[in-house]
UniProtKB/Swiss-Prot annotation:
It catalyses: AMP + ATP = 2 ADP. Catalyzes the reversible transfer of the terminal phosphate group between ATP and AMP. Plays an important role in cellular energy homeostasis and in adenine nucleotide metabolism. Pathway: Purine metabolism; AMP biosynthesis via salvage pathway; AMP from ADP: step 1/1. This is Adenylate kinase. It comes from the Bacteria. GO terms for molecular function: adenylate kinase activity; ATP binding; zinc ion binding. It is an enzyme of class 2 (transferase). Monomer. AMP binds at T31, R36, D57, L58, V59, G85, F86, P87, R88, Q92, R160, R171. It comes from Acidothermus cellulolyticus (strain ATCC 43068 / DSM 8971 / 11B). Residues 126-163 are annotated as: LID. One of its GO terms (biological process) is AMP salvage. Keywords: ATP-binding, Cytoplasm, Kinase, Metal-binding, Nucleotide biosynthesis, Nucleotide-binding, Transferase, Zinc.
Length: 217
């Protein structure tokens, strides 16, 4: 099965991507992993991407698409894959369709993790990170014994800039602006499946797996 997983920040996409891919026995492919491997292996694409990242710029679509194309040529994806973090735009989606068509394949389904904005804000703005060991706690879901102090090492806990409520709200706005056309694109093709991402991790995974049974027939 070939699928794409999309969802807003705080939807648990990384966790679900790993669990769903494991259930399907297909590789989880994330753009972050692809970037890191290309940079670590000092490939021509990795060197090019690093130039942009070091300058604080976004890696151009052409470089990202080329990296994904290389990855999808691997032997381990012949029976399927789960893409996490790609495509992000309609342009990238069209390029992905073209890549797969060249190989005589197609995308089977796009899973969209659907979660309430207020829940995303609760999940992310409640996170506290240890300044010493970098362990992440949560003021509601996984609080330390002593407020502001890490149970593991006694380090001071702080709130990352990315986890501040106003930053989270802005990230959500950007996500919806960028992703709405992509969601419409896949909905028009009839391969979009919404998954309720509220509740415990294992319940969300169970919903996704149940939905995928329909698409694997």
């Amino acid at each position: 099965m070939r699928l794409v997983l999309v969802g807003p920040p705080g939807a648990g996409k990384g966790t679900q991507a790993q669990l769903i891919a494991s259930h399907l026995h297909v590789p989880k492919i994330s753009t972050g992993d692809i970037f890191r491997k290309n940079v670590a292996d000092d490939t021509p694409l990795g060197r090019l991407a690093k130039q942009y990242m070091d300058a604080g710029d976004l890696v151009p679509d052409e470089v990202t698409i080329a990296m994904v194309r290389d990855r999808l040529a691997g032997d381990d994806v012949r029976d399927g894959f789960l893409l996490d973090g790609f495509p992000r735009t309609v342009h990238q989606a069209v390029e992905l369709d073209a890549m797969l068509a060249e190989a005589g394949a197609r995308l089977d389904v796009v899973l969209e993790l659907v979660v309430d904005d207020d829940e995303v804000i609760r999940r992310l703005s409640g996170r506290r990170t240890c300044a010493d060991c970098a362990h992440v706690w949560h003021v509601t879901y996984d609080p330390p014994t002593v407020d502001g102090v890490c149970d593991l090492c006694g380090g001071k806990l702080f709130q990352r800039e990315d986890d501040r409520e106003e930053t989270v709200r802005h990230r959500l706005e950007v996500y919806y602006q960028q992703t709405a056309p992509l969601i419409d694109y896949y909905a028009a093709r009839g391969i979009l499946e919404g998954i309720d991402a509220m509740g415990p991790v294992e319940e969300v995974t169970a919903r996704a797996v149940a939905a995928l049974r329909h698409w694997s027939r």
